[in-house]
Amino acid sequence: YHHGAIRLDDYRAAWDMARQTGVRLDFNLPRIIKENHQKVVEDLLTACAKDFPPTAVHVHNIGTLALVRRLTSLPIHADYSLIAYNQRTLQFLRDQGVVEATLSPELNMKQIQPLAKNSPLPLTCIVHGRLELMVSEYCVTGSFLGGNGEGPCSQPCLKGKYALKDRKEAL
């Protein structure tokens, strides 16, 4: 993991705190799971499901969706990166065992309203805040400025000095 995998002891402490305070605790799987991290994720997911079940597991791609279905019976939430953009996608996600989906952030209110009215499952929306443009193994900004190796990223892109420009040099 780019930011380091959560240890089972840390997850258990969070789970205990959530139970004591009546707060929901969802388990958010990584968007990208490298081949050499598959076993770690499987072991952690299995242990959490057995001993410290979260309220739900958030999945970001069809591979992790299949993994959660195979290893657990936990409720599954589809993250926005699964591109829930229309009724067919929402129905497919429901048929795959998803119990809640986050709509694609590209949708506007006019597009969201009919989906919300006719959705086969509960929906969530991202309404503000920074949104990643892509998920990549390597960060362009970080690779030039450093701090993008294994471990915590220095996130130079969030310091307000960098922006994407189109071919006309406009933001």
Task: Pin down the residues of each PLM region.
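Active-site pocket-lining/capping segments in soluble small-molecule metabolic enzymes
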Residues: 1-92, 96-171
